Amino acid sequence: MAAKEVKFGDSARKKMLVGVNVLADAVKATLGPKGRNVVLDKSFGAPTITKDGVSVAKEIELKDKFENMGAQLVKDVASKANDAAGDGTTTATVLAQAIVNEGLKAVAAGMNPMDLKRGIDKATVAIVAQLKELAKPCADTKAIAQVGTISANSDESIGQIIAEAMEKVGKEGVITVEEGSGLENELSVVEGMQFDRGYLSPYFVNKPDTMAAELDSPLLLLVDKKISNIREMLPVLEAVAKAGRPLLIVAEDVEGEALATLVVNNMRGIVKVAAVKAPGFGDRRKAMLQDIAILTGGTVISEEVGLSLEGATLEHLGNAKRVVINKENTTIIDGAGVQADIEARVLQIRKQIEETTSDYDREKLQERLAKLAGGVAVIKVGAATEVEMKEKKARVEDALHATRAAVEEGVVPGGGVALVRALQAIEGLKGDNEEQNVGIALLRRAVEAPLRQIVANAGDEPSVVVDKVKQGSGNYGFNAATGVYGDMIEMGILDPAKVTRSALQAAASIGGLMITTEAMVAEIVEDKPAMGGMPDMGGMGGMGGMM
């Protein structure tokens, strides 16, 4: 085990504070409408340019182990805020820096760190409750666009496209962000249920110009196993041929003789048919087949429930208005399922989303929910260069998280004003002793930090602006983009309540822990001696005759 270095008291806290300030100073330069960019060096390829707080924080690693601990703890604040609300990372970092700086001053003056922390915690609970009261529901497209615009660093086109996407696919819908190929942002919406499985044979294609197989008013056969024997399928194929309707087969796989027979029947025009693999794997595949069955009013042919392929009839088949299959995707449009069954399935999936602890499972369940209840929208980000594209894509993703948070918990006035207004919650708040009162007062000052930083980044005098905003009431605040005072909500400067709340909670939690630090332990870095040079090879005698 390597030897460790231990620092105590003030010397430990001073080192930690250096790390906190280095990281926070780099991150806070990006805050507000006039925040600057940060350039991040990459070991390969072009540098990344970003205004995203958490991206900057993740890149910072300091040489001194003790300073680095401070930096890593603040990085954790940004990550926590990002995980909770998907945005507000810079605000959280600025708040944490203010809490730690104010707190360590009080500790140096001889205050008890544990009581300071209790005071901070008390004040945080009161401010969070006040923020929830200040929040107004965010339902209309205009408010959603404004939230998206602010989060995307005042880029109106991004706010607009996100609001449009949300309007089209609803609150339950899935919105994904991809890199586009043009200069402009594009929005495409997939109607119906789409899953990432294409046709099993190109011979099913009946639209050569788009290389797609389109089936109008098809029947759907859903099978939870591999089909390789055509004999099992003959009864259902004959029934479909008599009905004179196209057939889509969704199975674990269709191979060998069964696939060849389907292709021949399709080419001869006996039965218009197409086959695709079922989406997902394992238990998720079963669940998705069941989703398709409920959406189309069919039944999954599975031996688990005592149904065999030979015994399948037209009653077991699902119905849809149209199915489009290309090389990669299958889209089922207007399934004929019973609305009450679909709603019951949606409720069941929502319950699973609440109960799951895995982020991956939650994401997959959300996708299933969107396919049943809403739809899927894809925002393709356009830019002139790859560097700009990456920076813009990160902003679109941030804005998307912010708008989702706004729909969830409502909006508050932006520009750091909500936190200043929430201070009224701790006007008469008293702790159990004088030191807790100092903790409450300390948070009162720290909460002004985001507004001060936004103003400083815009080149104005923070103290003057904070004083004027405090004299106002309600939504009155300072628009740093234009330098005008007024009603923040009317000016379209909104923040999601969830983002502001998560930022404060993350900052107070980790800031409080840092104040109460008394000792720090780190490994001693040993300077390894340089490697010795190569030994002398001596003369290459005896080679003279080779000329």
From Swiss-Prot:
One of its GO terms (cellular component) is cytoplasm. It comes from the Bacteria. ATP binds at residues 30-33, 51, 87-91, 415, 479-481, 495. GO terms for molecular function: ATP binding; ATP-dependent protein folding chaperone; isomerase activity; unfolded protein binding. InterPro entries: Chaperonin_Cpn60_CS (IPR018370), Cpn60/GroEL (IPR001844), Cpn60/GroEL/TCP-1 (IPR002423), GroEL-like_apical_dom_sf (IPR027409), GROEL-like_equatorial_sf (IPR027413), TCP-1-like_intermed_sf (IPR027410). GO terms for biological process: protein refolding. Together with its co-chaperonin GroES, plays an essential role in assisting protein folding. The GroEL-GroES system forms a nano-cage that allows encapsulation of the non-native substrate proteins and provides a physical environment optimized to promote and accelerate protein folding. PANTHER family: 60 KDA HEAT SHOCK PROTEIN, MITOCHONDRIAL. This is Chaperonin GroEL. It comes from Pseudomonas paraeruginosa (strain DSM 24068 / PA7) (Pseudomonas aeruginosa (strain PA7)). The gene is groEL.
